């Protein structure tokens, strides 16, 4: 395996960007959520706060996209609820990083500083959400690209490990002997 060398300037810029993002996440003002949005959040959350649940649900919906007719949506599959259960068993350090990532991702301050947007992710239009996610995916800062990859992989794995989503991708499930189906 070849050792990857990073120029000092790149290392310093990425370290500074990552430190800034993580520092901001702990002091960002919390938005007030509407009562109807909160009423849709399950009461039995284990990992996510109600706000984080809404953020992750919105991210997963934009990453996975609209289903074909007759196929389940991210809400019907319960992607955010499944992620909540899955992440509850994750390592404490991973949990802390995901809480910070969701806070930073939804922050209007971070959106303004990096993308000149004046809104939190939850308050953006569908088109702006897609563009914002794309900005994270293609960012010059490795910490943002890594954050995007984390959100994408969790979203996709929670959606496509549910058997209701298999038909859309042409997967029929495991081949089992006829008597075990």
Regions from the PLM with identified roles:
Residues 1-22:
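N-terminal secretory signal peptides and thylakoid transit peptides that target proteins
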Residues 4-5, 26-61, 180:
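C-terminal segment of N-terminal export signals and the immediately downstream linker at the start
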Residues 18-22, 66, 158:
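Generic hydrophobic alpha-helical segments
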Residues 20-21, 28, 138:
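Residue-level marker of structural boundaries
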Residues 25-26, 165:
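Short, polar/charged, Gly/Pro-enriched helix-capping and turn/loop motifs at alpha-helix termini
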Residues 45-49, 68-73:
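Short, N-terminal intrinsically disordered low-complexity segments that are rich in Pro/Gly
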Residues 55-61, 70-181:
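Mature-region segments of soluble proteins
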């Amino acid at each position: 395996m070849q050792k990857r060398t990073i120029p000092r300037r790149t290392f310093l810029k990425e370290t500074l960007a990552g430190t800034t993002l993580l520092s901001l996440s702990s002091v960002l003002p919390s938005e007030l959520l509407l009562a109807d949005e909160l009423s849709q959040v399950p009461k039995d959350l284990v990992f996510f706060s109600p706000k984080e649940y809404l953020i992750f649900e919105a991210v997963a919906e934009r990453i996975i996209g609209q289903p074909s007719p007759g196929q389940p949506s991210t809400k019907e599959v319960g992607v955010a609820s499944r992620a909540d259960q899955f992440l509850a068993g994750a390592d404490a350090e991973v949990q802390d990083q995901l809480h910070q990532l969701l806070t930073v991702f939804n922050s209007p301050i971070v959106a303004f500083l990096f993308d000149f947007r004046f809104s939190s992710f939850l308050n953006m239009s569908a088109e702006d959400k897609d563009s914002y996610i794309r900005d994270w995916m293609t960012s010059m800062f490795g910490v943002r690209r890594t954050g995007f990859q984390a959100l994408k992989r969790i979203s996709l794995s929670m959606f496509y490990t549910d058997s209701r989503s298999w038909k859309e991708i042409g997967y029929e499930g495991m081949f089992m002997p006829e008597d075990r189906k």
